Amino acid sequence: MPGNSRRRGAVRKSGTKKGAGVGSGGQRRRGLEGRGPTPPAHLRPHHPAAKRARAQPRRPVKRADETETVLGRNPVLECLRAGVPATALYVALGTEADERLTECVARAADSGIAIVELLRADLDRMTANHLHQGIALQVPPYNYAHPDDLLAAALDQPPALLVALDNLSDPRNLGAIVRSVAAFGGHGVLIPQRRSASVTAVAWRTSAGAAARIPVARATNLTRTLKGWADRGVRVIGLDAGGGTALDDVDGTDSLVVVVGSEGKGLSRLVRQNCDEVVSIPMAAQAESLNASVAAGVVLAAIARQRRRPREPREQTQNRMI
């Protein structure tokens, strides 16, 4: 009987799939065994899709310290009102004027910013065809201070009060913290060079001009910089909801650096280990943790209140209670 494997001389073929291993269509199943799934077309070197992908020009990665271009009438006007340093204001020819555009041009002229009129097509190319509403503001890279210079300037006005940001990613939080540092008598802000928000036009606007007065320094290694500051007599206090020291028990009259963690993960392990103490803000039981910039403002306000009325030595306080 055809197909009967029990007949004399019959040989059972290996494999579970039906059909010939070699046949019309060039399947050759045995040759493909163990090679895994077929990769996507753009990853196969000789496929037309891969050739097209290689032919496309690669977009350069924007560095954080490059010149920034702010687009749109409202963002440009907010930057000019906040005193964000700028080098040029670009206005497309034929753009319909309104109150915002008129104010932008007037403020740029008053601030000595170059006003450049250009064709809309040229502005499209300059902004990579992003929506610009006929106006763009060129903002130069921020001039960061050196961590050693920042500390030296703070120690010249004792007691020093500095804020370090441990991988904070939102530039609006950075700007808000710079504003709080200026409001409560701080001397500067320290940020990591990598994986951190930088002083962009967004941070400038949020700081409401405080970024022009409060220096910001960048550290190649935040943990190492904090260790160096501690060796020079500055007490490092971390800010975390699970901290073992309540804010009410912190002596804010010493030279301090307040370390604020990132929005999601808080303080990193190495930074936390190098803090002299980790401080928490007492809150109502039903309240959740505070935003990073809000928490920094609360701590800075508490420290400023103590410095306006320095705490009495503990021995005097105990004697008065007796």
UniProtKB/Swiss-Prot annotation:
GO terms for cellular component: cytosol. Residues 1-69 are annotated as: Disordered. S-adenosyl-L-methionine binds at residues 261, 281, 290. It comes from the Bacteria. This is Uncharacterized tRNA/rRNA methyltransferase BCG_3644c. Residues 1-16, 43-61 have a biased composition (Basic residues). PANTHER family: 23S RRNA (GUANOSINE-2'-O-)-METHYLTRANSFERASE RLMB. It comes from Mycobacterium bovis (strain BCG / Pasteur 1173P2).
